[in-house]
């Protein structure tokens, strides 16, 4: 006996449900691809504890990294209130307060869920190097106070560290070459590529207490103590680097004034680097607080009166006495003070006080060496009243020193480092590039990400839209056929 028409309907619906369900299953199995989900984002915080102030930088990078070094970008820059941490030597308990404002900004930027896994570092530079030389116990107290204050934050504080001058120079070199895409670039084909070594640029950094020069020389580095080697993005780099402690802008200009005091017989000092018409007073003792200063006179209780004479020629002669150029006579591989340096070559980026001074003097548009020299001399010859009247807002603190600073930079770069009219055009005076500040902190963060284990990117399953839509249709048909078969079974076949 054959099937009734109701049974045939029931059988057809079951068959349709089976075919549709099998088709949907095949689409799921065959049309699905294994894909990489967008990588998670990691964050890092670095405090730059300089001689005159402290800055905080927040960096971010994807958790899956290129050859074990994070692809890092700057997310926040903040200048802390107050002077540098070395200024709190007599009252270290207050140093933590000066850092809290910027730390709170950083914590607000970073998602709370990531606070506990965010590493935070503080690197101190020449200001603390000088304090450590002058009074190691006070320096240790300052570092201990910093560690206590930052250790209470919800992030992963890794400690406060005194950077060597060589580290400061090398990390600055890493920063600028990374920002310019000279260490690694993302190609149109979606791959990370490394440009040629010949395109790498040198770094010229000047803080308040020290100055650094770092570059890849044209030949071997003969003095291995001036060599730094590190690995980034799967490639090894070797650079010449040297840091001159006491040759930062603030310390150098303070030393010039101290030398003028020693050459004077009274308390009225005529300063050739200050504009004519300038007159100011300062405590004599303030010139001898730093280990960079010459021997102090027996009586430091008096005040000095300083008058400017606006004599750039005499100013240059006073500045040249700082360098001890005669110790390099007859040597092509010597900068000053007997320090080994290969001849400069290639392009350089000059930042920090190099940039601040030349930006004020409108010299960042790459004038010739003779043009820069003429501009600075013309500025030094201006009367103080004219300089004050034409100064932009917010420059009162540094205004008297721009003449001396400009001439000091020229003397350092030309007579010290050996730049000439021909190589001068290779210097770029910049403070930012690629959306990030130029300095040692980004290079420091890039180097430290080698210590953070690389994470495999998260994986998931994905389909093209067409396959997904077809699968949905067949799932709906399967459900409809199944429900139809159930209805036939319940309402028809039970009759």
Curated annotation (Swiss-Prot):
Ca(2+) or Mg(2+). Has lower efficiency with Mg(2+). One of its GO terms (cellular component) is plasma membrane. InterPro entries: GDA1_CD39_NTPase (IPR000407). Residues 1-8, 488-495 are cytoplasmic. Its EC number is 3.6.1.5. The active site is at residue 168. The chain crosses the membrane at residues 9-29, 467-487. Disulfide bonds join 78-102, 246-292, 328-334, 380-403. Glycans are attached at residues 303, 324. The keyword Glycoprotein applies. Its cofactor is Ca(2+); Mg(2+). Belongs to the GDA1/CD39 NTPase family. The transmembranous domains are involved in regulation of enzyme activity. This is Ectonucleoside triphosphate diphosphohydrolase 8.
